[in-house]
Amino acid sequence: MSSGGLLLLLGLLTLWEALTPVSSTDRPEFCELPEDSGPCKGLFHVFYYNSDQNQRLEFIYGGCYGNANNFKTIEECKRTCAA
């Protein structure tokens, strides 16, 4: 396959992955964790997945510790934890 064909295939696979929602059975367990600002005093606007409301919500992260249900962008949160 030519390099142009490989690039096209890679682009199509990337687009498919971005547009395919994650089912609740495929959702990582950390998506069920509550928001956790951590003990530090930073003021970082980040997002977490609220499994009770089935929504992606913003919260203030202190900058350390916390848990894995913490995303820099709403798009990253959606890709990882979308229902």
Swiss-Prot record:
Expressed by the venom gland. SMART domains: KU. It is found in: Secreted. InterPro entries: Kunitz_BPTI, Kunitz_BPTI_sf, Prtase_inh_Kunz-CS, TFPI/VKTCI-like. Disulfide bonds join 31-81, 40-64. CDD domains: Kunitz_textilinin-like (cd22594). The keyword Glycoprotein does not apply. The keyword Transmembrane helix does not apply. The record marks 41-42 as: Reactive bond for trypsin. Serine protease inhibitor. This is Kunitz-type serine protease inhibitor nigrescinin-3. It comes from Cryptophis nigrescens. The lineage of its organism: Eukaryota, Metazoa, Chordata, Craniata, Vertebrata.
